[in-house]
Amino acid sequence: MEEEGLAIDDVQGRADLRRIDIDRVGIKGIRHPVRVRDRSLGEQHTVARFDMAVSLPHHFKGTHMSRFVEIINGHDREIDIASFEAMLAEMMQRLNAEAGRIEMRFPYFLEKRAPVTGVRSLMDYEVALIGEVSVATTTTWLGVTVPVTSLCPCSKAISERGAHNQRSHVTTAVRMRDFVWIEELIEWVEAEASSPIYGLLKRPDEKYVTEYAYDHPRFVEDLVRGVAARLDTEPRIAAYAVEVENFESIHNHSAYALIERDKRTADA
């Protein structure tokens, strides 16, 4: 039996003689319940997946893995940009790190009404908060992946009947000057697609969505440019990345496009 009060050796704090710095070390895939801001309901309860890591100097053998979990458990409150950056700052302080990164991903649900019948259903979207600290600079991104429908303009133009269409994923990540709702990012993307996607459609709705998409054909280039143009005109957005993947219905590959822009640099 160990003597009461006997100090336990801190193995992680021992020296490592190989003199190799580690860029990132931490934990991945830990799930934790969180509350996030909801434009309609005030807040929404969901479950987030956290990846957390810090840099480790060559003279330390290991980091303190348990502290990452303690930090998450200590933030039992609504997560927004400010509280997320506070979590990032706490991680840097408690791990005594010069650089670090937290990535938090969670499903976010919106109630949508079908375009004709008005029947209600839930749609889920993947949202991400990504924060990085390096050389005393903190960078935070808010991202959301929005599924939409895209219909091919070329297929429509050359075909006597119909046109090929498919589901597309539009992933938009932004750095903000002022607060932007998750719902706004979703709405901006859906407005540029051939058609939004719904959780539930009745026959009149399906007819409407089919014809609406046919009247609004979009190449992958059209879709990525349309979203980028909206973000260019939004003063609350400082920088953005828009990524579009069309899961082609007539090919065994996807079509892809990406636009990245730092408006602060472009406006200088």
Curated annotation (Swiss-Prot):
Claim: Hydrolase is one of the keywords in the record: yes
Pathway where it operates: Cofactor biosynthesis; 7,8-dihydroneopterin triphosphate biosynthesis; 7,8-dihydroneopterin triphosphate from GTP: step 1/1
Signal peptide: none
Pfam families: GCHY-1 (PF02649)
Keyword Hydrolase in annotation: yes
GO biological process: tetrahydrofolate biosynthetic process
Enzyme class at the top of the EC tree: hydrolase
Keyword field: Hydrolase
Organism domain of life: Bacteria
Gene Ontology MF annotations: GTP cyclohydrolase I activity
Function: Converts GTP to 7,8-dihydroneopterin triphosphate.
Protein name (Swiss-Prot/TrEMBL): GTP cyclohydrolase FolE2
Species this chain originates from: Methylococcus capsulatus (strain ATCC 33009 / NCIMB 11132 / Bath)
